[in-house]
Amino acid sequence: MEKDTEELELENAVFGNINNFSSFLDKENETFDVMMNEAPELSEDNDAQEDELEKLEDAELFMFDTGSADGAKDSVPLDIIAGDNTVKEDEEASNEIPSIWEDSDDERLMISLQDHSRLRKLRQYEDEDMVNGLQYARRLRTQFERVYPVPEWAKKQDVTEEEDEFNALSEKSVIPKSLKSLFKSSVSYINQSSKLLAPGTINIKRLKDANFQAPSHSGIRCMSIHPYFPLLLTCGFDRTLRIYQLDGKVNPLVTSLHLRSSALQTALFHPDGKRVIAAGRRKYMYIWDLESAQVQKVSRMYGQENFQPSMERFHVDPTGKYIALEGRSGHINLLHALTGQFATSFKIEGVLSDVLFTSDGSEMLVLSYGAEVWHFNVEQRSVVRRWQVQDGVSTTHFCLDPSNKYLAIGSKSGIVNIYDLQTSNADAAPKPVTTLDNITFSINSMSFSQDSQVLAIASRGKKDTLRLVHVPSFSVFRNWPTSATPLGRVTCLAFGKGGELCVGNEAGRVGLWKLAHYD
């Protein structure tokens, strides 16, 4: 059966046409013959090279690299094998940018290129073996740049003298010195903790107890934060001063000092951070020099012994110049912090409850048990102001924020009044901006955070009695502490500079929490 026209066309499209293929092959052969005729000299050279290679022995065609230079009679340059990309060491050394730091041992260091198979590619001659450290580093760099060439954007651009002068002139005229000082460092100048803290709930997490590595054998009576470093000082009736490093993970004990003759009531870091002042219910106190490890005993206040039965309660002004001792019958005695010598004394009417200094040390505030506040000028030894706490009775403790704006006064009934000293009239008694009644037991501990946004108030009259107050809104955080928060009977409080909250209790533990807002 003969194939019709449609079937033949389909067969040619799928399998091709043998006649067309033969004619195409003949045309290709003719083209190849023409090219060979046009280049007769090239073909003769190739034939000559093939004849020469056929006459060579197999041993002459190949070279076995054994890694040793003993059997090598002639040193064949390996630059030929590497090609034109090989850079001579002398040229490369001259083109290198001078290093900022150089190691003198690099020139004395000798490295063998024959012992390690991976280093043989760095040789320039077959029998080359030992190179110094500088040559070795230079060849490694060259080998790397062969595989990964330097991109155009990383190459140093040639700057003409005119462009250099123009850039220097524009830099001097546009960028002032103050901006240049900022650009020299990569330190962040934005303080994330300066943002306002939101009221209502607080994000807080518990860390390992601050004194976990070396717990106290008695209740914690007083705590103090180092003015410059994350260090915590604790003291108690076990007669031991302990300093811990607050890292939140281990909190290691840095050092400790045992004073056999005094059950300690108060211990504070001096504002210079180099000394610790401690005292118990005795007529003397100790000044511990942390740098020299020397302990100085201060005693015998001449002329004031009758009004100072003990030195167990004292305060150090922020300038580090004076130590204020709480005495009997409303007396406050000031000592020179460096020498321990008596400086002067102040007196109020009634029973003394608490003493504090303003942040600049210019004024001393004294609280009486009869709900009266006295302002003294320290240098002039005079009364600046005196006012009565509104609806106050049996005031026990007060606290001033670092900005000298808010004054919190606690009472025996648990009421806490907060006053704004900067907006109040100096001639009249200030009015409280808010009154907190969340605690119904005597207030014995209060502390402001470093940015004055959080106020912690506590009482040891009942277990787990502590509240955190959002100062801008004067509201109590409702989510912390919870009924499961292990606080115990709180005896003292302290805020760290990084948002750490230290809580000491009668069981001798110092709980440590971290406010996430200050991370």
Curated annotation (Swiss-Prot):
The keyword Nucleus applies. Keywords: Nucleus, Repeat, rRNA processing, WD repeat. WD repeats lie at residues 26-66, 71-111, 216-254, 259-298, 306-345, 347-386, 390-429, 438-479, 485-519. It is found in: Nucleus, Nucleolus. PROSITE patterns: WD_REPEATS_2, WD_REPEATS_REGION. Disulfide bonds: none annotated. It holds the Pfam family WD40. Belongs to the WD repeat UTP18 family. Involved in nucleolar processing of pre-18S ribosomal RNA. PANTHER family: U3 SMALL NUCLEOLAR RNA-ASSOCIATED PROTEIN 18 HOMOLOG, WD-REPEAT PROTEIN-RELATED. Component of the ribosomal small subunit (SSU) processome. This is Probable U3 small nucleolar RNA-associated protein 18. It comes from Schizosaccharomyces pombe (strain 972 / ATCC 24843).
